[in-house]
């Protein structure tokens, strides 16, 4: 990652931390979970919460491996589409990122997988969404405690500390590094450049070397579109019976869903 861009991320975090933290607490209150507890299954938590906001979450393997998720709203319904062709850690972060857009955002976005895209960081809302995701998935009290534990187990080695934290919280390498810098657990000026340029191959190898679960770098390629389509159709039939919508509206919703699905799949 470009060092100057990293400085901007940390500067944004320092300036907006309290505001974003209040959003994390509001989201946790909405879902009925403790805001300082570790999230073991982010998708399980958000699926029902999103439905209360009239958003459906479904997983599809995209042809574009640079997009983590899409947030789209139309026809009275919203869709969060998660790219399952990516490693599990990226999917987890993308889901948490989309929580911000659904609950607090003003725009629709295609969430990028990496932190190093210039266009991505032209939007302040994307800084906010990433800060939100980091705070939600790596709660401060827990993160500080586990950082000390894993640093001790790693004999002070920064890379191994980050890899262990990454495995524990099931989040991307760069997200962990940024969280460490946000909380001033590491001094960015004193860190070697190689720490900022660790690629997926190196991460997987280090996970193996440390006897950690390498599968967090695998893609599930899950495709549950047909399941979501059935849910939407069932709800649509109920709304037609209650005279909230008509047959034409339901057909339009299903048609738009199918078009979005085909576009994402590249078919």
Describe the function of each predicted region.
Residues 1-267:
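Active-site hotspot residues in diverse enzymes, especially metal/ion-binding acidic/histidine motifs
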